[in-house]
Amino acid sequence: MSNHTHHPKFKTLKRAWKASKYFIVGLSCLYKFNLKSLVQTALTSLAMITLTSLVITAIIYISVGNAKAKPTSKPTTQQTQQPQNHTPLLPTEHNHKSTHTSTQSTTLSQPPNIDTTSGTTYGHPINRTQNRKIKSQSTPLATRKLPINPLESNPPENHQDHNNSQTLPHVPCSTCEGNPACSPLCQIGLERAPSRAPTITLKKAPKPKTTKKPTKTTIYHRTSPEAKLQTKKNTATPQQGILSSPEHQTNQSTTQISQHTSI
């Protein structure tokens, strides 16, 4: 408590405690004079004052404890976050060069194999393969290039020509009959027309033609019963004539022969 005696809230609490002491002394004097109603009201007010003072002291202690704990917790969080921010550095070209030179020095220090019989020298095949692997590992960083935009590689002249070809009208020459102003436009359109790949159109197989046979139309005539009877009679009479026709023909032939003889 000695550290917090200079705090302004503690000073107010001390003053309130002193005032409460004086208040208690005054109440005891009133009780001696048999003034019970005044004593009861004073006791209730004193109880309220003590409760509020206790609540205020508890709040002060909690706030002071939090203020002390906050500065101690901040450095710990910073210390834990610092190692997370550090990322491992990529190997630089200098490290690759140093490793490459060290491997070359080791390969040069080893003497080549010499055949005493033929006098020929043979290098170490294992060292050659190792050198090739080291070179293949060290080259990618040096040979890496930034991606080049295809738009930047094209010169600006091509864009201008393309724009000109689009703006000029393309007129077919078949429509320029008798128009002298149309003929130069027709030629310019053919020269400046943008070159495009020919479009291949697949021809569809023709559908087989189906010939529809004409349908016979039957006409039905309404016939009365009287007409039906007449047709039946007509059909009956020719049959009789047909049956009697050979005899009749023979009779006619005989009559004709007799006439010729009489003449």
From Swiss-Prot:
It holds the Pfam family Glycoprotein_G. The chain crosses the membrane at residues 38-66. Disulfide bonds join 173-186, 176-182. Changing residue 77 to I: In strain: ATCC 51908. Changing residue 45 to T: In strain: ATCC 51908. It comes from the Viruses. The keyword Cytoplasm does not apply. Signal peptide: none annotated. The record marks 65-66 as: Cleavage. Changing residue 249 to H: In strain: ATCC 51908. Residues 1-37 are cytoplasmic. Changing residue 190 to P: In strain: ATCC 51908. Residues 67-263 are extracellular. Keywords: Disulfide bond, Glycoprotein, Host cell membrane, Host membrane, Host-virus interaction, Membrane, Secreted, Transmembrane, Transmembrane helix, Viral attachment to host cell, Viral immunoevasion, Virion, Virus entry into host cell. GO terms for biological process: symbiont entry into host cell; virion attachment to host cell. Residues 72-92, 100-110 have a biased composition (Low complexity). Residues 69-166, 223-263 are annotated as: Disordered. Belongs to the pneumoviruses glycoprotein G family. This is Major surface glycoprotein G. The gene is G.
